[in-house]
Amino acid sequence: MSSRCKRCLNSFSEMNLKLKIAIIVIGFIHVSIAIARKSTDGVAHHRLVRLHTILITSTAMLSASYYIWKRVNFAITKLFKTLKSENELPIANSNESESDFAMNTLLPSPNPVGNRRLRLICFQDIAQALMMLFLFLSHIAMFFYYIFLGPEPNVIAITSLSFIAAYAHILIFLLIADVLFYSTKLIHSKVAPNSVHTYLKENRCYHILLALILGFIFMFAGLYTTHTDPIVRSASIPMKRFQSNSGNVSIALLSDVHIGPSVGRTRIAKIVELTNALKPDIIAIAGDLADGLVRDFHGAAEPLCNLKAPGGVYFATGNHEYMHGNVTEWFWFLENCNITVLHNLNKHITVNGQKLCVAGADDLYALRSNVPGHGMDLRKALGTCNSDSTNILLAHQPNAAKIVLSDSELSKKVNLILSGHTHGGQMYPFVPIVHLANAFVRGQYYDKSTDTYVYVSAGVNYFGPPIKMFGSCEIIFITMTQ
């Protein structure tokens, strides 16, 4: 047995009994759900996946919350200790007992210094209580995908989900502060006294409070973005297969609508209004329509039935249709709204004299979702798209676009790929991760070797926290030109 394994066993044996039992129970629950996920499919499978995701997130957040609480509580305690020391009362005179002096210190009195000290004690308790409430609401955020669901977001749900964004930013800023503190401490111990570390040590509580304040600033800035209208971003893409004696074709691209606990009917109605005002020839919904079941969010989704385009409204699945709802029920809902579902299918249309083949493939995640009959099949989706038409593919994840471009046969069939999924990162700290995980991140791309364009939308909405970077809630208006 390695020395690392021995250390782990020794650490476990040193834990108290209650902690050992808690770890064993949590481990047993995770293993049981993981086994159950392998043996189920369809709706039962996605419900287990959601439950397991919540448990994994909650388990990870316990450690993160302990870390945040220790740091912030240290800063609050030190700050109020400093303030109280500045308001200390004179030492009791010889004619006053210690108990009388203590009573006079704590009880309101004509002495303004004593009253200030009492108020500081109360403010410290209030600050600590508010921090505990913040952590609690952050922990229960994921449960609002199951409770208080309806046509419009619940106020408590919006607050809790917003706090998740502040929580993530605070955690990251605290980690950055600690990396700076301990790295300078290491240098300080090996070389001459380090003025940087001395400064960080003396002002550590203020840097922790700064991390807290910055977290909430980013949260409120993100709330402003998601509570204003999505911007319309225009793009012009030349199509070599277009007939010179015919007109241009416009497409309104909507991706990542994410109808759910933080996106309701009012928001969807506004998106529909803005989209219809563009008078597009085609409307494409490139996945991640909803984060729940039709029975919970049909009221919020109903305005989608008002989308109008002469060339039709088309939909292809994203990963969230498989993770958060019954995808078949959403297909029925959309078809009843005269929205064409492209379930590894294509449709031939003629718009403004131009021949088009609009295709849609199931999301990359579909196969892993264990939903019978679902899985990305690009050959089937593009099967009847011919070389004499301009072929458009709806593929939610940009990595699906990469698969198409890497295939010599498929790439000949596609002229334009429309994707979403990335949210452009959604929040600033996640931008590097999105760039690492996706072949394309945001905006217009051109692959010269295949003469194919890819457009990735940052999404019209957001997932989970109603927080997004400035200018990243967008409706894409593409004009395909000759």
Curated annotation (Swiss-Prot):
EC assignment: 3.1.-.-
First-level EC class: hydrolase
UniProtKB keywords: Hydrolase, Membrane, Metal-binding, Transmembrane, Transmembrane helix
Amino acids binding a divalent metal cation 2: D288, N319, H421
Domain of life: Eukaryota
Keyword Ligase: no
Membrane topology: Multi-pass membrane protein
Gene3D superfamilies to which the protein is assigned, alphabetical: 3.60.21.10
Protein localization: Membrane
Alphabetical list of Pfam families matching this protein: Metallophos
Sequence intervals crossing the membrane: 15-35, 129-149, 156-176, 205-225
A GO cellular component entry from the record: membrane
GO molecular function, one term: hydrolase activity
Binding-site residues, a divalent metal cation 1: D256, H258, D288, H423
Protein family per UniProt: Belongs to the metallophosphoesterase superfamily. LOC643853 family.
Protein name as it appears in the record: Putative metallophosphoesterase F40B5.2
Organism expressing this protein natively: Caenorhabditis elegans
